[in-house]
């Protein structure tokens, strides 16, 4: 009887852990379980290393997020488009400090830019040519978090 109770307790605990891991994406996610066959992502990268001891981040196939405390410097992800596409983005930035949020193409041309000193959530679409892009967050004494997700339009 004790073994059965222990097995039930272990199964219940495993279910709780699974729920926690699955909930890690973001409760405000707009583009859950999308298929982006023409967009490949990599990252997170840093221009000069992580200058924030409390920095944490995670990434998925169509999203990235980070939390930070007194961050200064540039973090970025890479997106590679195998063909020209219209891409929908959902950005949710919670902020104290300054962040320049931008998307640049392989020629270092800025295709999207937001200079932020306050929190901002927005949806936007970009017509992007085939090629490589960097999504950058240039921060100065910033505390907060960012969440970005994307999907290709059909």
Report each predicted region and the residues it spans.
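Bacterial signal peptide processing site
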Residues: 17-20
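Transition segment at domain starts
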Residues: 22-78
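Noncatalytic modules at the cell exterior or secretory-pathway interfaces
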Residues: 85-89, 125-143
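Short, surface-exposed beta-strand/strand-loop-strand elements in extracellular ectodomains
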Residues: 95-112, 150-151
């Amino acid at each position: 009887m004790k073994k059965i109770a222990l097995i039930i307790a272990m199964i219940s605990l495993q279910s709780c852990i699974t729920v926690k891991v699955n909930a890690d994406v973001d409760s405000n996610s707009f583009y859950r379980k999308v298929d982006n066959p023409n967009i490949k992502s990599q990252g997170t990268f840093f221009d000069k290393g992580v200058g924030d001891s409390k920095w944490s981040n995670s990434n998925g196939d169509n999203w990235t997020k980070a939390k930070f405390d007194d961050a200064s410097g540039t973090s970025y992800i890479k997106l590679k488009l195998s063909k020209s596409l219209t891409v929908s983005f959902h950005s949710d930035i919670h902020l104290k400090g300054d962040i320049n949020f931008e998307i640049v193409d392989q020629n270092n041309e800025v295709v999207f830019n937001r200079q932020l000193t306050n929190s901002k959530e927005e949806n936007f679409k970009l017509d992007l040519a085939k090629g490589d892009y960097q999504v950058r967050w240039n921060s100065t004494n910033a505390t907060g978090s960012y969440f970005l997700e994307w999907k290709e339009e059909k």
